């Protein structure tokens, strides 16, 4: 297991929820297994700059008298704030999540927010009108800057947007990806499928070791960022496909496309039976399963074992310090 050497201020992403209670605006995190907001002035898992900006957003909301969204009455405007920080370039993206597109004070909001930190490179409004606890909606509007920030990881450059899947612990991510590379034992003739690829981090990192990478991701914004990332890093052997991973792998013609190595990094909910069944049919030489959900990892591994694969190696990375979550890398082969 790779223990984190730095367990304070390690997160590059902060999500703040807002609630009005007894006339006071609360800004903080949800209490576990509830919709109760715990009002926080400072969280040690995040950087000083992220904490400073979070407090600035709260103060701006109070100053401009912006109405906080009430999930019971379905009224109000401000729902969440998302702060993403590059530890390499120090650039910061702030996304304000609103219940409707109408944001009357947005110009003043942007002005005051920019004055709070010179690290803020871009500000985005995300519109989420759904009655759900899911943070981000589908529609976005860039209020300031390019709509993304730049980050550097393992000698590669990446564009990060509000919707991009990107690991939250940069120093441990380096260890995670190096572990994947070490376990894969790739060669220059291999075709690698990077499923649930996000902004392309794993596939782009491994591209120098293989003949071809096929990266599949169902988020259009992430795919666009991945294409830009490949271009800026001058990588030409990684193909990016906008599709659901299950739908893609079910329709792969085994005769026309031979997948040698599968790298899969699904969400905490794990993969699908249809994806795993199609994987067994495709029969890649190796599967590297990267998981942040131990329960769903065990469930999916059982299916792959019944399909003829065996577990060669398991390695855990302490990605989420001070929580009961852990990142796991599993190498399987036939």
Predicted regions and their residues:
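A short catalytic or substrate-binding loop motif that flags glycine-/basic-rich loops and adjacent residues
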Residues: 6-11, 20-22, 73-75, 143, ...
């Amino acid at each position: 297991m790779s223990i984190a050497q730095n367990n304070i201020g390690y997160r590059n992403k902060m999500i703040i929820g807002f609630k009005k209670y007894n006339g006071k605006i609360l800004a903080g995190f949800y209490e576990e297994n509830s919709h109760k907001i715990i009002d926080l002035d400072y969280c040690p898992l995040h950087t000083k700059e992220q904490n400073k900006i979070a407090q600035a957003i709260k103060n701006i909301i109070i100053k401009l008298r912006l109405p906080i969204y009430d999930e019971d009455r379905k009224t109000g405007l401000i729902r969440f704030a998302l702060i993403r920080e590059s530890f390499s370039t120090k650039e910061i993206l702030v996304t304000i999540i609103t219940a409707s597109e109408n944001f009357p004070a947005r110009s003043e909001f942007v002005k005051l927010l920019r004055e709070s930190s010179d690290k803020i490179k871009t500000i985005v409004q995300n519109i989420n009108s759904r009655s759900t606890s899911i943070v981000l909606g589908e529609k976005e509007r860039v209020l300031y800057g390019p709509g993304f920030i730049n980050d550097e990881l393992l000698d590669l450059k990446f564009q990060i947007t509000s919707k991009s899947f990107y690991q939250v612990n940069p120093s441990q991510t380096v260890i995670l990806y190096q572990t994947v590379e070490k376990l894969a034992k790739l060669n220059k003739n291999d075709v690698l499928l990077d499923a649930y690829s996000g902004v392309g981090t794993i596939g782009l990192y491994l591209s120098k070791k293989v003949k071809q990478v096929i990266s599949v991701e169902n988020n259009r914004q992430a795919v666009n960022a991945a294409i830009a990332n490949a271009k800026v890093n001058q990588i030409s052997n990684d193909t990016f496909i906008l599709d659901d991973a299950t739908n893609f792998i079910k329709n792969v013609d085994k005769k026309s496309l031979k997948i040698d190595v599968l790298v899969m990094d699904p969400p905490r909910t794990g993969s699908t039976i249809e994806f795993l069944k199609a994987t067994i049919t495709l029969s890649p030489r190796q599967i590297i399963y990267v998981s942040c959900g131990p329960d769903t990892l065990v469930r999916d591994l059982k299916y792959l074992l019944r399909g003829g694969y065996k577990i060669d190696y398991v390695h855990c990375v302490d990605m989420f310090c001070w929580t009961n979550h852990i990142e796991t890398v599993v190498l399987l082969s036939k």
